[in-house]
């Protein structure tokens, strides 16, 4: 009789454990959706506590966006995931041609870096970005870019996304933008660690695998310089690159590489904050399984937030399911994952409720 009762209790308890894991895993996944109207499935996942955040694209933006964001926040607040702090909602508002919502910054990073008063312009750009995002009820920006371009018109310079071609201007402008933006109430993300400044024109990690064959010494004494300052300044998030850097890891792109993410960024550079991937569906990752498998690899590497930006709610859900399965099997460390969850909660606490 005791065995039967125990079996019945176990059968009841098992789903609760699964739900708890799904909620925990969900806080590590940032979802996206197509068009102007979110699908009901995404609202449902949010109410179940399986959505940790959103990324907004230009196709999602009209006059109804603030009300939609309020609805997501209300569902999140009523969900089992709520920890007293808001859901993180982000977009890419770098400036110039790279703006997802109406408003500033009107100048590109390159225009700011080339101006007569670059630090002042960068500070104003950070404030302008924050104002534009807050008007849409968005509380995080996947900007500024800290890549230091090597050639005029290369991948990162083509649309003016880099502040310049030397460590001084990128460090000073990137820091000014990030600090003023964060002080204005919007989370700042610096990207793309350890640097995409050497990528040639057309070498877009969103589309194809890219290898950046620089010496480790050059990366550490040049490309990483702006990140060291950002870390000292307490930057909110760091986004990793999807390029491969053979000088430290010839197999995995930086965002899937424990050598780059944990050993270099966390241990060597001392970063204790939140790390976020670039788009998990990127073409550069085609050799690393489906989106869920990539999410597990990134989590194993030490990344905290997985960016499911394919405009499909099922993409984020698939990543959550793979994370849960890996935690159950023990192929993803529960201890490390819980530490990662604490970092995300600490980040959320920086946002006003």
UniProtKB/Swiss-Prot annotation:
Its EC number is 3.2.1.-. GO terms for cellular component: extracellular region. Residues 94-119 are annotated as: Disordered. Residues 105-119 have a biased composition (Polar residues). InterPro entries: Glyco_hydro_3_N, Glyco_hydro_3_N_sf, Glycoside_hydrolase_SF, NagZ_Beta-hexosaminidase. This is Uncharacterized secreted glycosyl hydrolase ARB_06359. Keywords: Glycoprotein, Glycosidase, Hydrolase, Secreted, Signal. Glycans are attached at residues 165, 312. It comes from Arthroderma benhamiae (strain ATCC MYA-4681 / CBS 112371). SUPFAM superfamilies: (Trans)glycosidases. Residues 1-18 form the signal peptide. One of its GO terms (molecular function) is hydrolase activity, hydrolyzing O-glycosyl compounds. The keyword Metal-binding does not apply. Belongs to the glycosyl hydrolase 3 family. PANTHER family: BETA-HEXOSAMINIDASE-RELATED, HYDROLASE, PUTATIVE (AFU_ORTHOLOGUE AFUA_4G13770)-RELATED. GO terms for biological process: carbohydrate metabolic process; peptidoglycan turnover. It is found in: Secreted. Coiled coil: none annotated.
